[in-house]
Amino acid sequence: MKLWGGRFKEEESKLMEDFNSSLSFDKKLYYEDIKGSIAHVKMLVNQDIIKEEEKEKILLGLEGILKEIDGGILKIEGDYEDIHSFVEINLINKIGDVGKKLHTGRSRNDQVALDMKLYAKKSTEEVIECLKGLMDSLIKVGNENNYIMPGYTHLQRAQVVTFRYHLLAYFEMFKRDEKRLKNALEILNESPLGSGALAGSTYNIDREYTAKLLGFRKPVDNFLDGVSDRDYIIELISKFSIIMMHLSRLSEELILWSSSEFRFIQIGDAYSTGSSIMPQKKNPDGAELIRGKTGRVYGDLISILTVMKSLPLAYNKDMQEDKEPFFDAKDTVISCLKVMEGIISTLKVNKENLMKSVKKGFLNATEAADYLVNKGMAFRDAHKVIGEIVIYCEDKNSAIEDLSLEELKQFSDLFCEDIYEFIDYKNSINKGIKKEMGYF
């Protein structure tokens, strides 16, 4: 049974049926579809479009279908065109002809737009919760490992920071991601139900009522836009892509830091894998997969942008292709956030190796230049002097703080005994606004 067909003389080909069906993926929307139908039916009786006893039968049937699906009794499968057909046909089979009144004053166009918005809202809230979990782990692990480490530019050791402060940089990225998602929730918080196919309905339906019942701020202002708007999907996948970019950057650093060349951290066994041939290997596959899956979410974004780029108003069947990219992007970003939270919460930090890398990198060179500036030298001249000292140290395989005062005075008479206290790594990180890094 189909929800259409009266104007056709010939049967749809089996090839076209399979090609046209979206049930295999839009079955994810069963809860939202039934929830939207329940709100629609309650509105119909309020507006005297159907009778009270008809409403009761339909609601009982819909609630029964939902319970059977959740309980595994009713499987979402078969030759149905989509989840809407599945629910409606099963409703009619369950309660009889009164089930045919469910679709009064509604089109599948506004129905699917509603389903996707409800699902998008729920999905976004899930992603926000995962972000919060990861951010909590970053703060906790950072506070437990507030050790001095090299900060990098161009992947070259630059200045002293702390492991905690480095993790907090990612906390800030994810905090922005959370704000972006909350803003997206506000923008999409308008109900398309009642837009009909594209031009509303001749029935005196109450869109304000269903919008409120379904948790939306208001109904959409324009019917045409209501059924054809997929901006919120594009926006959310775009925001998911930014989250994945942040996760990928963090993954890259964790992969580097856990390598034998760095040995800054050790990723827990629970988030590592081994080699089928090399017994000694412990690979950071969790972080590598997150890095790899970033491109997958970018692909989902390009997919939906391409689907929508040339569509005339209003609804077009092309829009059926909005679901799989969104489902995939949402599932991917949630799994990656959860895995990253696990990686962060179980990693071990090698305090000694962090400090060894600090000592090898002339990370107090800028502070040494600041010292000369404080003694009256122009910064550009101080920059040149310290650069010459670095060359001298490299030739001697020494650090600036290991040079004698006599050696330092070969480069400038401004050096005094207090230079050593000034360029001490722990002291320097607590000078000026560096105190904001919170080393303690």
UniProtKB/Swiss-Prot annotation:
InterPro entries: Arg_succ_lyase_C (IPR029419), Argininosuccinate_lyase (IPR009049), Fumarase/histidase_N (IPR024083), Fumarate_lyase_CS (IPR020557), Fumarate_lyase_fam (IPR000362), Fumarate_lyase_N (IPR022761), L-Aspartase-like (IPR008948). Keywords: Amino-acid biosynthesis, Arginine biosynthesis, Cytoplasm, Lyase. Pfam families: ASL_C2, Lyase_1. Its main location: cytoplasm. It catalyses: 2-(N(omega)-L-arginino)succinate = fumarate + L-arginine. It is found in: Cytoplasm. Its EC number is 4.3.2.1. This is Argininosuccinate lyase. The gene is argH.
